[in-house]
Amino acid sequence: MTLKAVVGNDKGARFRVVIVGGSIAGLVLAHCLHHAGIDYLVLEARDRVDPQVGASIGIFSNGARILDQLGVYKSIEQLTESPVWYNMLTGEGALVQKVDSLRLIEARTGYPVTFLDRQQVLKILYDQLPTKSKVLTSKRVLSVDHLANDIRVRCEDGTEFTGDIVAGADGVHSRIRREMWRHAERNNALRYLKKDQEAMSAEYRCLFGISTAVPGLAGKSHYRTFNKDWSFLIAIGKDNRCYWFVFEKLDATRRPPTMPRYSESDQKEFVRPFLKRYVSQTVTFDAVWENKISSALTVLEEAQYNHWTYDRIVCLGDAIHKMTPNIGQGGNWAIESAAALTNKLHVMTKTTNQPTIEHIRATLREYEQSRQPRTKEVCETAGFATRLEAFSSFWHRVMSLYVVPYAGDMLVDVHCQAVAQAPKLDFLPLPDKSLRDGTIFRIAQLGGQEDKPIWRVLRALPFILLCIAAYNTMGSTTLVPHVHQMSSTERICLVEFLGDLTPLYIIAMVESVRRGNNFTIAVLWSLFGLVGQSKGIVYAVPLYFFLHYVQCSMVRCSSPDNRHVPIHYASTLVAAVGAGYLLPTAIVLFGSTNLDVSYLWKLFPILMTILHRVFASFAPNTSAVDRIENPRADMRYLRLAYGIGGILAGITRVYFWITPVHHMANLLSDMLQLWHEPLALRNVDLRQLIRHNHLLVLGSGLFWELLHFRDLKNARRLKASWIKVLGVLATTVVIFGPGSAMALGWAWREEVLASKIQLN
């Protein structure tokens, strides 16, 4: 039977995609192709496209944005409820962690993490297809053949269909993938064919299902139970509908053709040891099982394939990238692949309505190459999560119980970094929901270039060279002498230098508690301060600048909540700097000559940090709310801190100007001396040593700020020209000194990061 006899429409001259599989991947691809103006036909083996097999699907922001572009997301959203709470428990039911990370993900991406019946999503996708006649059920494909100008699909019922390409969206046991291998093997064409044929394996199995509301399991919550060799995942959806997964490690790694298949009686045997195990602090799994609507037991196949296409055959979804379901990205990655494939086909068909076979092959290879690196990463992440939750090794257990619970929003950061670069449909407008202010997708729309770590290292290399040069010329120096033994000129130089350091220490304190800088060198700034006090600030500060710049890229503070400085820290910052740095410094500089406290002053970096923590402990910690609802709440305190730092530095400059010492007149000569005679620094007096330290430390600080301004411009967050940036900073240096310039520059950067993103 020909296509014309079945659907009343032959291929003609139009480019057509034959989609095998009415899966999530297949139906989303059909929607994408429709919007791209590309003809398609969907062949589904079952007698309906939306069977209830007990499966659920998690819709994450990377998939939701594409569904929103296609106009189907609102219907899906009506069947879901935005979750808030993530609960992590041990196998004994002890609560390890309860956080609102799911709410934070929605704030960052514009879309909630939602679960619903897979059947519901399939029904929506099918019902909202403009041409349902192009979806044919009971069409189990047997073979695919390449013709001179077309590709032909033969079905079990004897029907045949032709198109320009065949897209395999027929799941993990894909017939189309096997047909692709058959053609490639016949022509000895694919380099890693043998490896692909042996790629699939399974180390775990999963009983998954859907239950009605279970008493004791709160709405808007996800529950994960971790234990040796098994784990639970339960997501509570709309009307407290319960979507659940029971994971268990197999006794051995299985590969085809020895992959086990399970019956309903196997489910009853499997579930028996799990019934009295905890899924929450008070609920055991038997309560979930008693309310079961549907369920299924299956092995969890894992496979990463090297070849996604051959000739005019291409695969997507589980047919070509099969991952474990622990991170919920299987369906979303299928949606991504459907969009990515359509983007390539759209570009090709806009060039010509009748592309050559070689053009088609090249386009499919581009799709393959564009998806492989990102897919490899997510498959590995999913596998790692499965093993982490089942304590596959001692280190998995340690990480689960003693690292992850104390990592703050690190997992949210990892998730958002992964989805931020997700593909979209390039030929359709972006949904308003994804472009809300502060979302990762809005930030990505700025089109800033990705900054690779090696380039950050190279740009920051002058800091290391400065440290080496300073050590070779100045040795180990400290500027904490007995102040009462200084001359008046030396004391004045030291006052100005220490005054200019005030903004630097304020900035370092801010960076040490900024949310986005968790687990970076920025949190250890006080150690650099101690090294500077004992071995020389001219080494410690540039080294801090180097490590901070390399680690703390724009990615770490691009989201509003990661730029945020918790209010209890921001509001006590000035007090901590005043009590921990300014007061001890004033005592050292202007105290009684009979009181030598300079040895205590060496410890001020630690003192300032301790005082900051103590003061902050008395202020309310509103971070949980502010990071989502009001991430700019810290700005008034930061403006105050930067302003006070800049004013104090400016006051010391004014104090210096009204003294007989003409520091600015000697600045150029100092710079020339450092350039032409660096070795002469070994023989300078204390006044010159202070001035040289002043010049090197604050000069490196301004260079550090310029590097961060460069990041702002690269990310297209800063509209001001380099002439304006350099002019403002240079003018401030001349009038108020480098310390005030540092305060102004960092305050400017803070304002840019906190401002609403303008896409025009």
Curated annotation (Swiss-Prot):
Pathway the protein acts in: Secondary metabolite biosynthesis; terpenoid biosynthesis
One Gene Ontology cellular component: membrane
One MF annotation (Gene Ontology) recorded for this entry: FAD binding
Its EC number(s): 1.-.-.-
Keywords: FAD, Flavoprotein, Glycoprotein, Membrane, Monooxygenase, Oxidoreductase, Transmembrane, Transmembrane helix
Annotated localization: Membrane
UniProt topology in membrane: Multi-pass membrane protein
Organism domain of life: Eukaryota
Cofactor(s), by name: FAD
Any one biological process term the GO annotation gives: terpenoid biosynthetic process
Residues with attached carbohydrate: N518, N621
Chain ranges passing through the membrane: 18-38, 460-480, 492-512, 527-547, 570-590, 599-619, 641-661, 725-745
Positions annotated to bind FAD: E44, G58, R118, D318, G331
Family listed: Belongs to the paxM FAD-dependent monooxygenase family.
Entry function: FAD-dependent monooxygenase; part of the gene cluster that mediates the biosynthesis of the meroterpenoids nectripenoids A and B, as well as cochliquninone D and isocochliquninone E. The pathway probably begins with the HR-PKS ntnH that catalyzes two chain-extension steps to form a reduced triketide, which then primes the SAT domain in the NR-PKS ntnG to initiate three more cycles of extension to give a linear hexaketide corresponding to the polyketide part of nectripenoids.
Annotated protein name in UniProt: FAD-dependent monooxygenase ntnK
Species: Nectria sp
Annotated gene: ntnK
